Amino acid sequence: MAFDNEFTLGIEEEFQIIDPETRELRSRVNEMLEEGRMLLGEQIKPEMHQSMVEVGTGICNNIKEARRDVIHLRRTIAELAYKNGLAIAAASTHPISHWADQRITEHERYAQLIEEIQHPARALLIFGLHVHVGIQDKEAAIAIMNAARYFLPHVLALSTSSPFWIKQNTGLKSYRSEVFKQFPRTDIPDYYNSWSEFENYVNLLIKTGCIDNGRKIWWDVRPHPFFPTLEFRVCDIPSKVDETICIAALFQSIVAKLYKLFRQNLGFRLYRRALIQENKWRAVRYGLDGKLIDFGKQKEVPVRSLLLELLEFIDDVVDELDCREEVNYLHTIIENGNSADRQLRVFKQTGDLRDVVDGLMRETVEGIFQVA
């Protein structure tokens, strides 16, 4: 099956803006935006807290193109930060800084969010990775979303980067996930029997004043309300470019594999949200060191083993997508650990969260200035 520009990619990363002297967050995104918009146009934007900057790739035809774009974006905002005496870091929580010390961006959207959601919105000082995979067929998109839910805890465990929160070791590998759960319409979605059933759900929420559009459905995976993509939102932002690219390639491959099964009328067993939620909690708590439940076998299996099984599951599509090298980086993450693991190792060695921040700042720009 030739894919022919199916499964295009878009990657959004949200970065911390840091004072490299104090290692604290700084609400200074506006100092980066004027020149940033000249260089990147709509690819750079502020978020609710002014200590965050978001960048997003264009529509990429393959993972190689996505890598070039991600590196270019990281390099550009790192240089913008440096010009202003700042630095950037990629992790889903800041180890030290408090949300109450960050300024809120003046924008009607954020004012409305805070008015509606109150404290959970003000405290939403978390940073994410969103991966869009193109899919034109709406019925296929819903079927793929239903099946892809099963793999969300697996990839979350691979990505975890938020063990610390306001100077505390939370004991979780992805504290970001717990912070975001305080918002409505988040977490693992239920499954839908058709596009029309999903559309009826969205229209009901709009009709009854719950939301004004589908953008306020913040599930871990969702059909994008305005673009023909499935948007994967479950992951922490990895610190290293190679990790981001590996995760994006995994999501692209999962979509391509499930689409292939859909076209062949081969079913994929759908599990209830409550069951997948059990696995998500395990990924949040333990990351790569945990065990997930294999629901078919009704037993616990180490995350690392399940990730290797995931590689086998997608093996027959990765060459057509030209992403074998990128998904195989999973072996490196399994062997060496992810951002959360490295942060915890540094803290165990030095006992100083400033050293953790230093490591994040280094890893975020690792290798990006050696690439033309």
Place the predicted regions along the sequence by residue:
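C-terminal accessory/tail domains of diverse enzymes
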Residues: 1-84, 113, 180-372
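Well-ordered mid-protein domain cores that form the structural environment of catalytic cofactors
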Residues: 61-126
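An acidic- and aromatic-residue-enriched active-site/binding cleft used to recognize and process polar
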Residues: 20, 86, 91-96, 129, ...
